[in-house]
UniProtKB/Swiss-Prot annotation:
GO process terms (BP): protein folding
MF terms in GO: unfolded protein binding
Protein name: Prefoldin subunit alpha
Complex formation: Heterohexamer of two alpha and four beta subunits.
Cellular compartments annotated: Cytoplasm
Record bears the keyword Oxidoreductase: no
CDD domains, A to Z: Prefoldin_alpha_GimC (cd23160)
Primary subcellular site in the record, as a coarse category: cytoplasm
Gene3D superfamilies reported in the protein's UniProt record: 1.10.287.370
Organism field: Pyrobaculum arsenaticum (strain DSM 13514 / JCM 11321 / PZ6)
């Protein structure tokens, strides 16, 4: 391998290392977003299950740390269906929709975690090679 070939290979490794780092950053941001959505969906599912539990006084979070106390006798909730559409669904169907979304986002989160792991492993391999070559 000529010096020129070695330089080109080193440059390619450096570029790959930078690209892998950018991809890792993007995947980690997506992972954080999916984790937040899962938390929100789980909270909503808990709320629907509480409503299914029967009448009684409840505290409902209305944002910014504020809660309102009330008695809810509703049998339906306005549920997002996707693509900006909402529908009033009975509590059982709302629970089913939320559970399906939780499963979908859980699979996505697992996939992101696997990809993050693979990219982190590749980044470490490249870093070790560059380190052995005295670069970085």
């Amino acid at each position: 391998m000529s010096r020129q070939d070695v330089r080109q290979e080193i440059q390619r490794l450096i570029e790959e290392y930078q690209l892998v780092g950018e991809l890792l950053t993007n995947l980690q941001a997506q992972h954080a977003t999916v984790s937040e959505l899962l938390e929100e969906l789980t909270t909503a599912l808990d709320g629907v299950r509480l409503l299914k539990g029967g009448a009684g006084e409840r505290l409902v979070h209305i944002g910014a740390g504020l809660f309102v106390k009330g008695v809810f006798e509703t049998k339906e909730v306005l549920t997002p269906l996707g693509a900006g559409y909402h529908a009033f669904l009975d509590l059982d169907n709302a629970e089913r929709v939320l559970q399906e979304r939780i499963e979908e986002y859980s699979r996505l989160k697992t996939s992101l975690e696997e990809n993050i792991g693979k990219l982190a492993e590749r980044a470490e391999q490249i870093r070790q090679v560059l380190e052995r070559l005295g670069i970085r």
